Amino acid sequence: MDKSGSPNASRTSRRRRPRRGSRSASGADAGLRALTQQMLKLNRTLAIGRPTLNHPTFVGSESCKPGYTFTSITLKPPEIEKGSYFGRRLSLPDSVTDYDKKLVSRIQIRVNPLPKFDSTVWVTVRKVPSSSDLSVAAISAMFGDGNSPVLVYQYAASGVQANNKLLYDLSEMRADIGDMRKYAVLVYSKDDKLEKDEIALHVDVEHQRIPISRMLPT
């Protein structure tokens, strides 16, 4: 007896076969969802360390202390003869010094070599008495007393030295913005004459947030 006309056979013949590739497409969708979840998780993890309004980046990828931001100033040393010194007191903008009682936690100096840089310089930051005239003799003595960290920055074959930052921690001294005029950046040109267009010094002063600090520093 021919069973091809039976109801069961008819229903079987009418069943749609799975479309070619549907199973692989489903697997791809699952893989995409898994990848998306991984990316979201990674994004959340990275976001923890990103600078925000309250925690702007200060040292490399390190964030400022909670409740702190920083103000940057740039110094360009003049010509410094071989074996001689240069010093300049920190001068923050009036919009910052108006809040002179806000605490300062750290000072960072970043040496930016310009295209002509081919020298060796020593850089430090020191609290200098107001009576000091920042003479060569006075600066020389401050470099030699060992009371402050010193960054030695020198020309490299590549033109760039990896370590170009000096960090000075003031948190235990309870220094404030008003005290910053008592601090000076000091430079010693060791091996040869430093031309005025060889380096720029970027000084970052990390301090408690003030009312005007509503944007990330640039």
UniProtKB/Swiss-Prot annotation:
Predominant localisation class: virion
Positions bearing N-acetylmethionine: M1
Compositional bias of kind Basic residues: 12-22
Matching SUPFAM superfamilies: Positive stranded ssRNA viruses
Protein's UniProt keywords contain Acetylation: yes
Region (Disordered): 1-32
GO CC terms in record: ribonucleoprotein complex; T=3 icosahedral viral capsid; viral nucleocapsid
Stored Gene3D superfamilies: Cucumovirus coat protein, subunit A (2.60.120.530)
GO molecular function, a single term: RNA binding
UniProt keyword terms in alphabetical order: Acetylation, Capsid protein, Ribonucleoprotein, RNA-binding, T=3 icosahedral capsid protein, Viral nucleoprotein, Virion
RNA-binding in keyword set: yes
Domain of life: Viruses
Cellular localization per UniProt: Virion
Biased composition (Low complexity): 23-32
Function: Capsid protein. Probably binds RNA and plays a role in packaging.
Similarity section: Belongs to the cucumovirus capsid protein family.
Protein name from the UniProt record: Capsid protein
